[in-house]
């Protein structure tokens, strides 16, 4: 079981080297993938940004969004974790804290490409930094 943040998912969807290295792990049928519902908005926004700046065609961005929607990813509401998200406010954005809180509750590692999130203190999550 692993928790993914949007940075990892975008790396996979864009088929970047770090995403390609993760593919075997993320597409393993024995591996359960989890994320807060927030991931949907963050991935859609990232794809929108890449399309808007010309790094992706509108068609490619849409294909990536469709591929994301088909991922076997169990999404969790973040409202049960609001108190913990608030407790983490000194070191993490509310967005990052949603992923961390979920990883804490599930006792699962959180995969991220976000160096700031990976180095943030004050939580009990196991965070794996995926570097490009």
Label every model-predicted segment.
Residues 8-9, 39, 81, 99, ...:
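Alpha-helix capping/helix-boundary segments
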Residues 71-113:
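Active-site neighborhoods of divalent-metal-dependent phosphate/nucleic-acid chemistry enzymes
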Residues 21, 42, 84, 119-120:
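Phosphate- and divalent-cation-binding pockets in alpha/beta enzyme and binding domains
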Residues 1-38, 50-59, 122:
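Short, well-structured N-terminal submotif of metal-dependent ribonuclease cores
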Residues 44-72, 84:
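Active-site-proximal, substrate-binding regions of enzyme catalytic domains
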Residues 1, 100-132:
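Acidic, PIN/NYN-like endoribonuclease modules and their adjacent C-terminal/linker elements
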């Amino acid at each position: 079981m692993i928790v993914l943040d949007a940075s990892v998912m975008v790396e996979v969807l864009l088929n970047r080297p770090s995403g390609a290295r993760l593919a075997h792990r993320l597409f393993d049928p024995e591996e359960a993938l989890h994320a807060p519902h927030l991931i949907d908005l963050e991935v859609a926004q990232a794809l929108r940004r890449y399309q808007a700046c010309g790094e992706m065609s509108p068609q490619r961005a849409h294909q990536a969004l469709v591929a994301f929607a088909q991922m076997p990813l169990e999404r969790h509401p973040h409202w049960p974790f609001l108190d913990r998200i608030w407790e983490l406010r000194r070191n993490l954005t509310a967005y990052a804290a949603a992923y961390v809180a979920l990883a804490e509750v599930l006792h699962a590692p959180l995969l991220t490409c976000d160096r700031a999130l990976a180095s943030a203190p004050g939580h009990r999550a196991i965070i794996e930094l995926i570097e490009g």
